[in-house]
Amino acid sequence: MLYHEKFDVIVVGGGHAGTEAALASARTGQSTLLLTHNIDTLGQMSCNPAIGGIGKGHLVKEVDAMGGLMAQAIDHAGIQFRTLNASKGPAVRATRAQADRALYKAFVRNVLENTPNLTLFQQSVDDLIVEQDQVVGVVTQMGLKFRANAVVLTVGTFLGGKIHIGMESSSGGRAGDPPSIALADRLRDLPFRVDRLKTGTPPRIDARSVDFSELEVQHGDNPTPVFSFMGNRAQQPRQIPCYITHTNENTHDVIRANLDRSPMYAGVIEGIGPRYCPSIEDKVMRFADKNSHQIFIEPEGLTTHELYPNGISTSLPFDVQVKIVHSMKGFENAHIVRPGYAIEYDFFDPRDLKLTYETKFIKGLFFAGQINGTTGYEEAAAQGLMAGLNASLFTQGKEGWSPRRDQAYMGVLIDDLSTMGTKEPYRMFTSRAEYRLLLREDNADIRLTEKSRELGLVDDARWTRFNEKMENMEKERQRLKETWINPKSEDIDQLNQILKTPMSREASGEDLLRRPEMTYSQLTSLDRFGPALEDQQASEQVEIQVKYDGYIQRQQDEIEKSLRHENTKLPADIDYSKVKGLSNEVVLKLTTAKPDSIGIASRISGITPAAISILLVYLKKHGLLKKGEEA
């Protein structure tokens, strides 16, 4: 049966990638259908109850700067907020929050149900309708056909999903949910490169069975940080602590004695797991010299007794899981309410994607989230937003858009995936970005909101707030530049008490703020340089921009040099075997990768600077270089 309404964009999957994709498409005015196997699981946190962290918090802020949902959802559902790396420089500071799962899911669903241009429908998708190498719709489990100009697949761990607990395995997309077998089979028939990955989750614990007096308490920050540029602390629910315990030699002995019952070590699981979130059995074997591992005990919400022991993800049999839990301090009598498990699933080589997340083989088909080999809610949300935006642009006949590596962590993410691919679940870190001093959490809106407004993603309220902040920053910097003090001023003693060395010559407010010992709040506490801005986001920007001005300018200069050929287009029909001087290896890699630009080609493993020079000469010879791209 053909559904009566044709949509502009169909999004398959209602997780963190799917919700952002559907909302981005709908926000840009496209009629959008979100298909999910279960409407009650929209926005569900399948693994740990937390958002943010190093590199990840940066992605959340970028999603927010572009009008996305994740930051606002966690501001309304976060039960403990912390700034990580608070003592370090602003480039690597990151926000992280524990979430109340129920509050988070409820907030997401409420937004989805009340978004114009967005229709929700509960059905699993079994097939794609493809005509002349272009997707034109989907077929659901009960044979319903929905037609659209573009389809975004955000299917998480559901493609060919298999759950492992010990040597027992069963089909599943996650505990309690069926996998997508028919869709996985259909995608394997298409010309994509496919492989398997693995992830896992720990057993959940009943808090009433834990002796908290034996645990170390970990409180959140006070005052709490806020994720969204539109958020405020009044939106946050009641704050509660987390706790810390440790594994010990007894724990490790239990694990080592039962490795023959681990599906990972017995060769049952073929997929590679996440390097930066390994299972407890992996940690014990890889770090054999360590006799203890820190385990973070995270509450799952304000109205549940469930605890998430972050650090003991496992696929060992349930009886072994019980022994592991009971071996830890404070957990001697702990009751497990849900067993831990590993899940193996299909992913598709992201080198088969364009920078817009559109697949290279099927027009109008976009992939986002774990299907691309990533791990993490934040990475999924960032991909979902970009895929949804570009699906919308595709349906409008407009050129796609993706930020560059120097503009956003989102740009680093898709560039890494589409040029290098991945053999293990990909996680974002600040260390992956060359220009991280420019890609800070605090300036995500300055980097992305104006472009997002142009693309139709940002509403009037956010745009008004953004312009207000920019105006406040500009006025405050001008005020500090124009306010001077000299060593003979009457109020010089007040200033010298703050400075490490007394003033010897006249200085402006900006000159003083550049000094490492001077903060904006200290400076504006002085009568001459007060009052401070009430807009805290703007004052934070003023301080960072003034203090790091030289370093920021240096990175900007580096970027301008590297961008000279970054966007030089490579024709889609170029025959690299006809480019004289390229080695057979380079020809093969370029033909396989089909890079869109010189910048992308330069980051493919094995493509040398000499090969790039040969390509530029070829492009110039054939009149394919624009003015300013020569040499």
Curated annotation (Swiss-Prot):
The keyword Ion transport does not apply. The keyword Cytoplasm applies. NAD(+) binds at residues 273-287. Pfam families: GIDA, GIDA_C_1st, SAM_GIDA_C. InterPro entries: FAD/NAD-bd_sf, GIDA_C_N, MnmG, MnmG-rel, MnmG-rel_CS, MnmG_C, MnmG_C_subdom, MnmG_C_subdom_sf. One of its GO terms (biological process) is tRNA methylation. Its main location: cytoplasm. FAD binds at residues 13-18, 125, 180, 370. Keywords: Cytoplasm, FAD, Flavoprotein, NAD, tRNA processing. GO terms for cellular component: cytosol. It is found in: Cytoplasm. Its cofactor is FAD. PROSITE patterns: GIDA_1, GIDA_2. GO terms for molecular function: flavin adenine dinucleotide binding. NCBIfam families: mnmG_gidA. Belongs to the MnmG family. Homodimer. Heterotetramer of two MnmE and two MnmG subunits. HAMAP family: MnmG_GidA (MF_00129). NAD-binding protein involved in the addition of a carboxymethylaminomethyl (cmnm) group at the wobble position (U34) of certain tRNAs, forming tRNA-cmnm(5)s(2)U34. This is tRNA uridine 5-carboxymethylaminomethyl modification enzyme MnmG. It comes from Vibrio atlanticus (strain LGP32) (Vibrio splendidus (strain Mel32)).
